[in-house]
Amino acid sequence: MSISESYAKEIKTAFRQFTDFPIEGEQFEDFLPIIGNPTLFQKLVHTFKTHLEEKFGKEKIDFIAGIEARGLLFGPSLALALGVGFVPIRRVGKLPGECASITFTKLDHEEIFEMQVEAIPFDSNVVVVDDVLATGGTAYAAGDLIRQVGAHILEYDFVLVLDSLHGEEKLSAPIFSILHS
């Protein structure tokens, strides 16, 4: 068993499930216990870092873009480990300055995401990170913001992909996930 496989098993055991959250009929996969455990959090970042270095060794990653809310929790640590910049993708009204925005549907309501337009220079290479890929709407919206400023998405990276929801079908770049469910 590789180190990454061993780490994945440990990470999986830390997830907590909440039924009927945030809406009835949904099962919420909570990865916050991973963040609360420094050893496990280091293993999470190490797993992503190792994957990205192996896959994009010669191709420069310029930025990690973290999606609100949980991509903002581990994205900066991953960016720091890789020695690249970090860009937050936030809900409307959370970022100062000129922002690109996109409206999208999430579960049973519309949301608006924003990203500062000067945060990612034209022609940059970006990896988008978030905790869970479900239907793909949130990740698609984040990718659209990145494309609006003329940057390239190398990959979407998730801690967990809910395979039965086929969210990867909406995305325009490859995905990587530590766990699948």
UniProtKB/Swiss-Prot annotation:
GO biological process entries: adenine salvage; AMP salvage; purine ribonucleoside salvage
EC number: 2.4.2.7
Disulfide bonds: none
Keyword Cytoplasm: yes
InterPro entries: PRibTrfase_dom, PRTase-like, UPRTase/APRTase
Pfam families: Pribosyltran (PF00156)
The protein's annotated pathway: Purine metabolism; AMP biosynthesis via salvage pathway; AMP from adenine: step 1/1
Catalytic activity from the UniProt record: AMP + diphosphate = 5-phospho-alpha-D-ribose 1-diphosphate + adenine
Subcellular location: Cytoplasm
Family: Belongs to the purine/pyrimidine phosphoribosyltransferase family.
Note: Present with 937 molecules/cell in log phase SD medium.
Protein task: Catalyzes a salvage reaction resulting in the formation of AMP, that is energically less costly than de novo synthesis. May lack catalytic activity.
Official protein name in the record: Adenine phosphoribosyltransferase 2
Species: Saccharomyces cerevisiae (strain ATCC 204508 / S288c)
